[in-house]
């Protein structure tokens, strides 16, 4: 099992994730994504969007505002019900979520005793003001989830897209929660990104579609992101764990170095959200669906798939990370990312920094850069350059040597196996495309 300290070290050293405001001492639970981190996030988002929107003719996209009218959060139940229970240790003053610790045992921080305060409720929403006057009339919240922006746009999307039940609305965006405790690197933070889809169905079809989306989402992690199946599992919520809006819920959990934790939730939200907004807005017809074939009118039920993008980044790094002992006794660190997710698809190396080789290398770079994100490197030994690319997950390295001048061939080295092939420059594009398309993951890594 990979160690969390190895992931954090790699993330900072190679430019995936940096501590936010580090030059000023850092801000707890806040992280900046570096050059490789933004590429990995972008690639995961791209695959999620493709799997949700492009591969389903009845799912469309939305990008709703972070700031919305505060009535929306009162209607959704977040103002009154979106809270965690917290306790403080009276000895060391540390604060904990009550459901994260055993209150009958010693404080996990100071170990002195179980001298805790009584649990008290703590609302997780960030409140701020819009305008020049800070009073109750200018209060707004940073959204704690992206879902409500979808629900209040139900009628807009339905009418403008000419959709029929069942259909879905997908969205990727930032959400904010004033977490009592931020921990485990980028896993639990106050600012994060969600990839959510709300699927609207006839009430009588809710169970059928709930089962469909459970399996669909698990397949996404295994078949698209190539996450190890033995590190994924379903976990059902019992009645005491359900959110205020949910009738049923399953989590997809991944085995992180700190244990199994949620990366995506699949929820049967019933008609709770649409009914609440119909009531609070006093516009019931806006949230009602009229089936023109059956003449039936009803408020649709909703199945939600809610994945954490930032958690998916951490999961992907943990799952891809490996350390290998080589035959010469050396060790290499490899990120076995699927090529679709790798920040760079190709690295191009002139064997030495001589103009006759760098000119060819630059020409190949320009020929391929429209279709592949490429890293160009002409410093250091070839062995060191290979190791640098292994660490960041680049699947293919292309070396231009003196034979290239003679026969227009290059050496293509594959990351996982370290095998090398001579390929004609004119065939390089199609070769890399085919290799990515036919990539097979070894889950026994």
From Swiss-Prot:
Subcellular location: Cytoplasm
Residue positions binding ATP: 177-179, 187-192, 262-263, 308-311
E.C. number: 6.1.1.14
UniProt binding sites for substrate: 97, 145, 192-196, 304-308
Pfam family, one: HGTP_anticodon
NCBIfam families: glyS_dimeric (TIGR00389), PRK04173.1 (NF003211)
Family, as annotated: Belongs to the class-II aminoacyl-tRNA synthetase family.
Protein name: Glycine--tRNA ligase
Annotated gene: glyQS
């Amino acid at each position: 099992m990979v160690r969390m300290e190895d992931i954090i070290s790699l993330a900072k050293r190679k430019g995936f994730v940096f501590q936010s405001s580090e030059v000023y001492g850092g801000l707890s639970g806040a992280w900046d994504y570096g050059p490789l981190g933004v590429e990995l996030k972008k690639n995961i988002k791209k695959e999620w969007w493709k799997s949700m929107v492009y591969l389903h003719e009845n799912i469309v996209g939305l990008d709703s505002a972070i700031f919305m009218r505060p009535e929306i959060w009162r209607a959704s139940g977040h103002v009154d019900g979106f809270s965690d229970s917290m306790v403080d240790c009276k000895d060391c003053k540390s604060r904990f979520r009550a459901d994260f610790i055993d209150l009958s045992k010693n404080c996990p921080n100071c170990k002195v005793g179980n001298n805790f305060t009584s649990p008290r409720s703590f609302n997780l929403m960030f409140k701020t003001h819009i305008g020049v006057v800070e009073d109750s009339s200018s209060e707004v919240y940073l959204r704690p989830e992206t879902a409500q922006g979808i629900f209040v746009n139900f009628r807009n999307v339905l009418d403008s897209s000419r959709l029929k039940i069942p259909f879905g609305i997908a969205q990727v965006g930032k959400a904010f929660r004033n977490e009592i405790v931020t921990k485990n690197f980028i896993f639990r933070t106050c600012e994060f990104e969600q990839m959510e889809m709300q699927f609207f169905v006839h009430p009588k079809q809710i169970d059928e579609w709930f089962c469909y989306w459970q399996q669909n989402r698990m397949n996404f992690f295994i078949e698209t992101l190539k996450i190890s199946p033995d590190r994924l599992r379903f976990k059902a919520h019992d009645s005491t764990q359900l959110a205020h809006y949910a009738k049923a819920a399953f989590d997809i959990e991944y085995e992180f170095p700190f244990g199994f934790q949620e990366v995506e939730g699949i929820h049967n939200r019933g008609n709770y959200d649409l009914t609440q907004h119909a009531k609070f807005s006093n516009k019931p017809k806006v949230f009602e669906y009229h089936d023109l074939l059956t003449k039936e009118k009803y408020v649709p039920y909703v199945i939600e798939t809610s994945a954490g993008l930032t958690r998916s980044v951490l999961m992907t790094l943990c799952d891809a990370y490996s350390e290998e002992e080589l035959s010469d006794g050396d060790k290499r660190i490899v990120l076995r990312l699927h090529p679709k997710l790798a920040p760079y698809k190709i690295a191009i190396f002139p064997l030495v920094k001589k103009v006759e080789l760098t000119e060819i290398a630059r020409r190949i770079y320009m020929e391929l850069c429209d279709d592949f994100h490429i890293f160009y490197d002409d410093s250091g030994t070839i062995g060191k350059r290979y190791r640098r690319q292994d660490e960041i997950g680049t699947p293919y390295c292309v070396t231009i040597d003196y034979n290239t001048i003679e026969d227009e061939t290059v050496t293509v080295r594959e990351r996982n196996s370290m095998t090398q092939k001579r390929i004609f420059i004119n065939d390089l594009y199609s070769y890399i495309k085919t290799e990515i398309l036919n990539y097979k993951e070894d889950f026994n890594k």
